[in-house]
From Swiss-Prot:
Composition-biased stretches (Low complexity): 470-489
Protein name listed in UniProt: tRNA (uracil-O(2)-)-methyltransferase
UniProt family annotation: Belongs to the TRM44 family.
Keyword Methyltransferase: yes
GO biological process: tRNA methylation
Enzyme class: transferase
GO molecular function, one term: tRNA (uridine) methyltransferase activity
GN (gene name): trm44
Function: Probable adenosyl-L-methionine (AdoMet)-dependent tRNA (uracil-O(2)-)-methyltransferase.
Region annotation Disordered: where it falls in the sequence: 455-489, 537-606
Organism this protein belongs to: Emericella nidulans (strain FGSC A4 / ATCC 38163 / CBS 112.46 / NRRL 194 / M139)
Composition bias type Polar residues, residue spans: 455-469, 546-564
Enzyme Commission no: 2.1.1.211
Length: 606
């Protein structure tokens, strides 16, 4: 039997830091001169050493919901982790995993039948046979009842550095007499004791020694998260009178852990810091979900963000792309900007697009397609007709390079050639064009003003890029065969448009999609950055404000005789005059010549 830890030395060293964490959580305010109280709680046959307790007034039901959410999303407590895959579960109560599966099913049902069929075929043929996972037996804890058992696999971000680890999570609950006391209070029946309810989760990794534990996991054999919630009895009258139940309940949150035999005499600063952070994240997340100022977080659905593509697929593809391309791109980067920001951002976008195209078209990366051909000559995986892509304002071209290297045909263009283009293979450089795209509506106006077609290298029709006939499973982009001229307006009608930080062309992205195929516009992906208007000028769009109701300000809405007041009319006229003056001072047409004149006039007022 392991003995309780002697925490006095660690407490004296880390006293101020522990109090800082408590103040951040805003759970209790204790004077710094007061000593930190620790207690050893023996809930099991083995004595567990507890961390610092924090007083809280959060209901155990809310704590339990948050514990389930953090159990499925360990990345909130450790930046090293991606996610947790649920391998097995048992119990009666629904979990957030079930809610997530239900939400994903609703999203799939809303998609088209063709896309669903392709996605289902791909997913079914990609399923791997998983090894059976043995569940660690649950402990019998006095006063607690086993509520649910989950077996999860912690997936790290860098699996070449950290290994995944399986973990059995036992969820216990103890309602106590709180519900009964509440009913008795409504009926006016006196009470003789202060009730409590408790919630507990025990995490046990599937390892035989601490050497098998990865870096991100605390060096403990097992860990128990305990939350006790109840009412404090306050006596009134004689000594033997019935206690009055306080209106404000109190909760106590603590973490108990079972150390290894060689670590029972001390607690490392890293372990103490990790356990304290677990409590802090638990409280902060629970309070955030219950914050009335953020009603959207009160629903479990609001916490689920991967409604388009399942998170595990995007993360696995991102890890594969990062291991394949990140090091090489960072080493060969020749731009003056920081490579890590651009490289990893484009890798994540590429991972999302690859999984999106898998569902939309049934197209898979080239390596995966070759593996499927070797395994089965009759396999249909990856045989979907991919229409090709175009990356407008492609910038450094990293996204185009990754997608082409993964076997997806397409091309990109930008107004200025970038240094990064030179580090790519020749076939990729041929698909990166230095062009300026002027939308067709503007070219029609210019052509009408000049009474004839304009021969200018900056016009839409000048973007000549030969296309070849699509091959089986793919379609080729520009510069891959014949010399047929094309432009953005003459691209294949199903071309997928990528608008990644396209600035002036961001608003034009859905319009370009509609111009390609008005009857059935192709899908596109727009990731906005700087805000511009359709004219190309910088413009910040203000959010639409809700109109005040007539019951809130009736005097401003209507005068005594049923007409608008004179003050309102005067203010509206003044507003129109001010807007007219601002319009004259600040041209919004994108006229560079006029803007330059205004700038020179401001610099030389005399």
């Amino acid at each position: 039997m392991a003995r309780a830890l002697a925490l006095s030395r660690s407490v004296q060293v880390c006293k101020s830091r522990l109090f800082t964490v408590a103040s951040k959580s805003a759970i209790t305010k204790r004077c710094l001169s007061n000593p930190i109280q620790y207690r050893s709680v023996s809930l099991f046959a083995t004595t567990y050493a507890p961390s610092k307790d924090l007083n809280s007034r959060l209901h155990s039901e809310h704590i339990g919901d948050t514990a389930l959410y953090l159990l499925l999303n360990p990345g909130l407590t450790s930046s090293v982790l991606f996610r947790a895959d649920i391998l097995a579960q048992s119990g009666k109560c629904p979990t957030l995993a079930a809610l997530e599966a239900q939400k994903q099913q609703e999203t799939e049902e809303a998609s088209t039948a063709t896309a669903m069929t392709m996605a289902q075929n791909v997913i079914e043929e990609e399923k791997e046979v998983k090894e059976p996972v043995v569940e660690i037996p649950a402990r019998e804890v006095p006063g607690f009842e086993l509520h649910k058992t989950l077996i999860r696999r912690l997936i790290p971000r860098n699996q070449q550095l950290d290994m995944p680890v399986d973990q059995t999570c036992h969820l216990y609950s103890h309602a106590g007499a709180v519900e009964q006391i509440e009913k008795e209070k409504e009926l006016g029946i006196p009470h003789s004791r202060a009730p409590k309810e408790r919630f507990m989760v025990i995490y046990t990794p599937h390892v035989s020694s601490k050497e098998e534990l990865p870096y991100y996991h605390p060096l403990v054999r097992s860990m128990a998260f305990v939350y006790e919630f109840g009412y404090t009895g306050e006596f009134e009258g004689p000594e033997n009178s019935i206690p009055r139940i306080a209106e404000n309940p109190k909760g106590t949150m603590s973490i108990h852990f079972l150390p290894y035999e060689n670590d029972v005499d001390s607690i490392s600063a890293r372990l103490e810091r990790s356990l304290t952070k677990l409590i802090e994240v638990q409280i902060r997340t629970t309070k955030g979900r219950l914050d009335p100022c953020r009603p959207s977080t009160s629903s479990p659905y609001a916490l689920i963000k991967d409604n388009v593509i399942p998170r595990n697929r995007v993360q696995d593809t991102y890890s594969r792309l990062k291991n394949k391309y990140a090091a090489n791109l960072n080493e060969r980067w020749i731009e003056s900007t920081e490579p890590s920001k651009h490289v990893f951002e484009d890798l994540s976008i590429a991972a999302f697009l690859i999984e999106l195209w898998r569902d939309l078209y049934g197209a898979v990366p080239g390596d995966e397609r070759e593996q499927q051909k070797q395994q089965s000559s009759t396999s249909k995986v990856g045989s979907g007709q991919f229409p090709g892509f175009v990356d407008i304002a492609c910038g450094n071209g990293v996204l185009v390079y990754i997608l082409i290297s993964e076997g997806y045909s397409g091309w990109g263009f930008d107004a200025r050639r970038r240094k990064t283009w030179s580090i790519f293979p020749t076939d990729v450089q041929e698909r990166l064009k230095e062009e300026i795209y002027i939308p067709k509506p503007f070219m029609d106006v210019l052509a009408a003003q000049n009474q004839g077609p304009i021969q200018n290298k900056n016009q839409d029709a000048s973007m000549q890029s030969p296309l070849s006939e699509p091959q089986s499973g793919q379609s080729n982009g520009p510069n891959s065969g014949t010399s047929t001229s094309t432009s953005l307006s003459n691209l294949p009608k199903d071309t997928f448009i990528i608008s990644n930080h396209a600035d002036e062309l961001t608003l034009w992205t859905p319009i370009l999609s509609t111009l390609l195929n008005p009857a059935n516009p192709p899908p596109f992906l727009a990731i906005p950055c700087c805000s511009h208007s359709l004219s190309g000028a910088r413009h910040r769009f203000r959010p639409q404000s809700a109109r005040p109701s007539a019951t809130q300000n009736p005097q401003k809405q209507q005068g005594e005789n049923g007409t608008h007041s004179q003050d309102e009319e005067g203010s509206s006229e003044d507003m129109k005059e001010r807007k007219g003056e601002e319009k004259e001072k600040n041209p919004e047409t994108g006229d560079l010549e006029q803007m330059r004149k205004d700038k020179l006039a401001a610099q030389n007022p005399h």
